[in-house]
Amino acid sequence: MLLDPLADAMSTIKNAENVGKPECIIKPASKLIAMTLKVMADLGYIGEFEFIDDGKSGMFKVKLLGRINRCGVIKPRFAIKVAELEKWERRFLPARNFGVLILSTSQGVMPHTDARARGIGGHLLAYVY
């Protein structure tokens, strides 16, 4: 039974990276997964990804670059303010300026660095480094 599609997607990416596969398939597809993959692609952690319609919920085909050491979701999805970002960075990232927290904000899904620059908080979704 699939309870958290985003957690399943991050687990699939992490396992495929650990084995050294050049690409992976993420099922089922959702808008939240698409926005999270876009943030990861913009930051250079993954290559291109494309949506494949299979007549059901769809799937994503993701090109892997071998740049992810670890990735995962943050549960429960804590609501944080801008001032609390550093506390959560220390908890989930291994070093300062290494890796990224992915947040869902009122202005869309973005990395924590963009949220800090814009001065907005949001809900923690995932971490990647």
UniProtKB/Swiss-Prot annotation:
GO MF assignments: rRNA binding; structural constituent of ribosome
SUPFAM superfamilies to which the protein is assigned, alphabetical: Ribosomal protein S8
Keyword rRNA-binding applies: yes
Pfam families (alphabetical): Ribosomal_S8
GO biological process, one term: translation
Keywords carried by this UniProt record: Ribonucleoprotein, Ribosomal protein, RNA-binding, rRNA-binding
InterPro entries, alphabetized: Ribosomal_uS8, Ribosomal_uS8_CS, Ribosomal_uS8_sf
Signal sequence interval, chain numbering: none
Transmembrane segments: none
Recorded GO CC terms: ribonucleoprotein complex; ribosome
Function, as annotated: One of the primary rRNA binding proteins, it binds directly to 16S rRNA central domain where it helps coordinate assembly of the platform of the 30S subunit.
Quaternary structure, from the entry: Part of the 30S ribosomal subunit.
Family classification: Belongs to the universal ribosomal protein uS8 family.
The name this protein goes by in its record: Small ribosomal subunit protein uS8
Lineage: Archaea, Methanobacteriati, Methanobacteriota, Stenosarchaea group, Methanomicrobia
